[in-house]
Amino acid sequence: MNYQEALNKGIRILKSNEIKSFILDSEILLASSLKLDRTRLLLNLNNNIEENQKEIFFNFINRRKENEPIAYILGFKEFWKNNFKINKSVLIPRSDTEILVDQVLKEIKKNERKQILDIGTGSGLSLIHI
């Protein structure tokens, strides 16, 4: 089985389980299984997938088809171009949070001093970046 065949099978599985971003999710999960970025994956679709990589990929696909978030499957989430370790006991930071952090940073620059309290809001990534 080559990368393209594995990818197509992953796409079919996720699509049939009504995962909205079935193509993107399949690409991300296959790339991660192969320890490649998505660009390198897409440039090498004719390469053969090793058995252990295939097993990892379809394990990921089976978890995703049950609606487990990609961040929990991979164990990390990108936030402000940095990867942060994530697990099921931590809320996954959303892209809206990046916008909020950006707005807070702009406001802080306008004024001299601010006190910020971040309690029980999830991963703590917003406070780390502020």
State the predicted function of each range:
Residues 1-57:
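A short N-terminal interaction module
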Residues 16, 106-110:
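Secondary-structure boundary motif
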Residues 25, 96, 115:
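Amphipathic alpha-helical recognition patches that constitute DNA-binding helices
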Residues 32-107:
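Conserved AdoMet
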Residues 112-120:
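Conserved class I S-adenosyl-L-methionine
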Residues 123:
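Conserved SAM/SAH-binding loop
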Residues 128-130:
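Conserved small/polar residues in nucleotide/adenosyl-binding loops
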